[in-house]
């Protein structure tokens, strides 16, 4: 083993500041000289519209997988793709990478992008968004919001996360470094939960600029990130008159008083017929007097004289006018000037 190999295999016990910046050690053929014990295989189905494209690029797929000692099969009758290991396969994880590659190709990812997943530092994530929104109209609108006008939003997500992102049907396929995949998943899920992607894009741009400043490495970045308020425009209309709920009581409401109960309480029940009639007449005359009084007040409103200003207030006004100073010199000069104009004319 050479010195460079010994340096790579040396395990560091120092504390790690940034786990994302750690280099993944390469797995070589010398690390597994005996190969695989048993054969492993994975199969996936693809839609009918991908049949023509897969048939054209399948020789390239076989050539790419043969470099890693894997076998690939395309079954056009069943509409499936199969990858399996061989006796020469020495990397135990390459079959998982090959499975991800055929899954991406089934989700309309081109072969030139899908083959990148075979690299050690590249991963993939297929995000299912079909069940996140109940109504189809809302789902289509939010999915289009993720793409943006002329694909501008999707392109900005790709540039900020260093990932290839493809929106197809009910899934979003992402391919790139693992940190970028985490960011893409957060943006997609929040977009389907009615959070516009521009907010997360702006936050990513600010974080990228903050990472350049070493002084802010150990500080909280929340004060720099924008805070957006949730505005729910479609609120339910509230009634004009709200009914206030009465306090709950386990007992039934009391029985309302009848006419006889009211007469017993007032003592009217024990009066004879003549006394009852006299009481009714008295109440009637009192009501008539009150009505006549209100009517007289309404009629006499037109004959009430308006309030005049007091003599003291008028005298104050006159004193104020007389006390105003007059500039005699200015008035005299004005008269002389007017006389000169009259003579000259």
Curated annotation (Swiss-Prot):
<feature type="compositionally biased region" description="Basic and acidic residues">
    <location>
        <begin position="315"/>
        <end position="329"/>
    </location>
</feature>
<protein>
    <recommendedName>
        <fullName>KRR1 small subunit processome component homolog</fullName>
    </recommendedName>
</protein>
<dbReference type="InterPro" id="IPR024166">
    <property type="entry name" value="rRNA_assembly_KRR1"/>
</dbReference>
<keyword id="KW-0217">Developmental protein</keyword>
<keyword id="KW-0694">RNA-binding</keyword>
<dbReference type="Pfam" id="PF21800">
    <property type="entry name" value="KH_KRR1_2nd"/>
</dbReference>
<keyword id="KW-0175">Coiled coil</keyword>
<keyword id="KW-0539">Nucleus</keyword>
<dbReference type="GO" id="GO:0005730">
    <property type="term" value="C:nucleolus"/>
</dbReference>
<feature type="coiled-coil region">
    <location>
        <begin position="270"/>
        <end position="298"/>
    </location>
</feature>
<dbReference type="Pfam" id="PF17903">
    <property type="entry name" value="KH_KRR1_1st"/>
</dbReference>
<dbReference type="InterPro" id="IPR048549">
    <property type="entry name" value="KRR1-like_KH2_euk"/>
</dbReference>
<comment type="subunit">
    <text>Monomer. Component of the ribosomal small subunit (SSU) processome.</text>
</comment>
<feature type="region of interest" description="Disordered">
    <location>
        <begin position="273"/>
        <end position="329"/>
    </location>
</feature>
<dbReference type="InterPro" id="IPR041174">
    <property type="entry name" value="KRR1-like_KH1"/>
</dbReference>
<dbReference type="InterPro" id="IPR048550">
    <property type="entry name" value="KRR1-like_KH1_euk"/>
</dbReference>
<keyword id="KW-0690">Ribosome biogenesis</keyword>
<feature type="compositionally biased region" description="Basic and acidic residues">
    <location>
        <begin position="276"/>
        <end position="302"/>
    </location>
</feature>
<dbReference type="InterPro" id="IPR048548">
    <property type="entry name" value="KRR1-like_KH2"/>
</dbReference>
<comment type="function">
    <text>Required for 40S ribosome biogenesis. Involved in nucleolar processing of pre-18S ribosomal RNA and ribosome assembly. Binds to RNA. Required for female germline development, cell viability during eye development and for survival of dividing cells and epithelial cells during early wing disk development.</text>
</comment>
<comment type="similarity">
    <text>Belongs to the KRR1 family.</text>
</comment>
<dbReference type="InterPro" id="IPR036612">
    <property type="entry name" value="KH_dom_type_1_sf"/>
</dbReference>
<keyword id="KW-0687">Ribonucleoprotein</keyword>
<keyword id="KW-0698">rRNA processing</keyword>
<feature type="region of interest" description="Disordered">
    <location>
        <begin position="232"/>
        <end position="260"/>
    </location>
</feature>
<dbReference type="GO" id="GO:0032040">
    <property type="term" value="C:small-subunit processome"/>
</dbReference>
<dbReference type="GO" id="GO:0003723">
    <property type="term" value="F:RNA binding"/>
</dbReference>
<dbReference type="InterPro" id="IPR004087">
    <property type="entry name" value="KH_dom"/>
</dbReference>
<feature type="compositionally biased region" description="Basic residues">
    <location>
        <begin position="232"/>
        <end position="245"/>
    </location>
</feature>
<dbReference type="GO" id="GO:0006364">
    <property type="term" value="P:rRNA processing"/>
</dbReference>
<dbReference type="GO" id="GO:0005654">
    <property type="term" value="C:nucleoplasm"/>
</dbReference>
<feature type="domain" description="KH">
    <location>
        <begin position="125"/>
        <end position="193"/>
    </location>
</feature>
